[in-house]
């Protein structure tokens, strides 16, 4: 997807350009799943892909460290003219406040939810963060394939080893070609089913 705007700086937000600490507030409260998964193990970066509900990749970018809220925020804000209606993300509980503090008007109509698979580990998060909560009252959300991203990410694992031996320039090109083929196959399958 082409870039539609630049990511602004937010000088009134302390640490806006610092490392992303996840959903932890100043008292150390918040979503502890984020910290226990990424903070302790200091996971390295890789690819962050944005998937539609049909597991077609809208785009990707390389990240140097573990994926954080800023990566997702920046991808959404710089590539979509209008914010998506629904964002299904592993750590939507931390992403929603991060986005709303920075661009409240842009994200005012966006629903941020945690997919069914990842919701299990979010023991401190309220039910308002879970897709299943909204499915009970909004039938259209029952049609959302909340595992589309996981399906797509499992496809990316096919090239993980090969890409790890390439220069960054070649790895990006290889990934772009892989995802183009992946997307074409998904789209053809959908056309065949209709």
Task: Name each region found by the language model.
Residues 1-194:
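Catalytic-core elements of nucleic-acid end-processing and repair enzymes
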């Amino acid at each position: 997807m082409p870039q539609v705007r630049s990511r602004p700086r937010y000088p009134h937000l302390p640490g806006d350009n610092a490392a992303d600490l996840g959903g932890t507030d100043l008292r150390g409260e918040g979503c502890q799943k984020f910290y226990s998964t990424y903070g302790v193990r200091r996971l390295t970066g890789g690819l962050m892909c944005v998937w539609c509900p049909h597991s077609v990749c809208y785009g990707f970018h390389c990240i140097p460290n573990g994926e954080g809220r800023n990566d997702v925020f920046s991808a959404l804000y710089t590539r979509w003219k209008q914010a998506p209606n629904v964002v299904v993300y592993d750590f939507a509980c931390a992403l929603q406040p991060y986005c709303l503090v920075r661009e409240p008007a842009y994200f005012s109509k966006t629903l941020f939810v945690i997919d069914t698979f990842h919701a299990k580990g979010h023991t401190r998060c309220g039910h308002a963060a879970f897709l299943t909560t909204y499915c009970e009252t909004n039938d259209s959300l029952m049609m959302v394939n909340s595992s589309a991203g996981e399906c797509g990410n499992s496809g990316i694992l096919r090239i993980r080893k090969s890409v790890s031996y390439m220069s960054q320039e070649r790895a990006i090109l290889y990934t772009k070609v892989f995802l183009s083929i992946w997307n074409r196959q998904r789209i053809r399958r959908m056309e065949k089913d209709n």
